[in-house]
């Protein structure tokens, strides 16, 4: 008895013909800190830490690094904290980044608010000093003082099962802001936009 043979290269094969493999879009992420870098590397993303001090300086450095890259990417992102940046400087920095082809995932006040959205929606301003107590209810060994690539990777491992909730909660808080001027946002992050994009690029 002869073994069955299947010609997988035949154009008449319906399985082969109808199968579509989505193309992953390439992306590079400039991050203000190493914690963010460690977190986003868990999405198998290319990351580069940007040093600059003020938000405007960070944007300027990201633009320089983008121009010095050896290859092109489909998307360029910058992850940055608003911190104490004035509304005028904040909007100027955002506009400068976008004019140079860099999308900005910003957090008001700091990136760690993204951790909070994994557990609940935030409807009012949360003092960054209160982040730790809330997060420790779910990640018991968490410390706000722990920073760095390993800390970012650790938080990804601890929280990635709640990713859909975090995206939904952060999107809801963003959409409910009473002003359309992002410079006056409080306890909001647009990191969910970047994470949503990366999550859709992951192979399953």
Region locations from a protein language model:
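C-terminal accessory helical subdomains adjacent to catalytic cores in phosphodiester-
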Residues: 2-8, 13-24, 37-50, 68-75, ...
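Hydrophobic "anchor" residues on beta-strands that sit immediately upstream
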Residues: 28, 77
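Helix N-cap/beta->alpha junction signal
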Residues: 32-33
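A short, well-structured beta->alpha microelement
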Residues: 51-67
């Amino acid at each position: 008895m002869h073994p069955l043979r299947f010609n997988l290269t035949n154009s008449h094969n319906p399985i082969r013909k109808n199968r579509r493999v989505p193309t992953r879009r390439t992306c590079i992420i400039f991050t203000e800190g190493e914690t963010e870098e460690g977190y986003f590397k868990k999405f198998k993303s290319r990351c580069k830490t940007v040093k600059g001090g003020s938000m405007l300086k960070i944007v300027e450095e990201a633009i320089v690094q983008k121009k010095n890259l050896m290859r092109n990417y489909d998307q360029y992102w910058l992850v940055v904290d608003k911190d104490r940046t004035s509304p005028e400087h904040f909007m100027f920095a955002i506009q400068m980044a976008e004019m140079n082809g860099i999308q900005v995932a910003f957090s008001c006040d700091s990136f760690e608010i993204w951790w909070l959205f994994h557990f609940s929606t935030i409807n009012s301003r949360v003092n960054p000093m209160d982040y730790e107590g809330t997060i420790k209810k779910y990640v018991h060994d968490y410390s706000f003082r722990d920073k760095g690539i390993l800390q970012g990777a650790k938080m990804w491992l601890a929280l990635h099962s709640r990713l859909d909730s975090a995206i939904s909660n952060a999107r809801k808080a963003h959409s409910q802001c009473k002003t359309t001027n992002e410079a006056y946002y409080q306890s909001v992050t647009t990191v969910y936009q970047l994470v949503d994009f990366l999550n859709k690029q992951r192979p399953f």
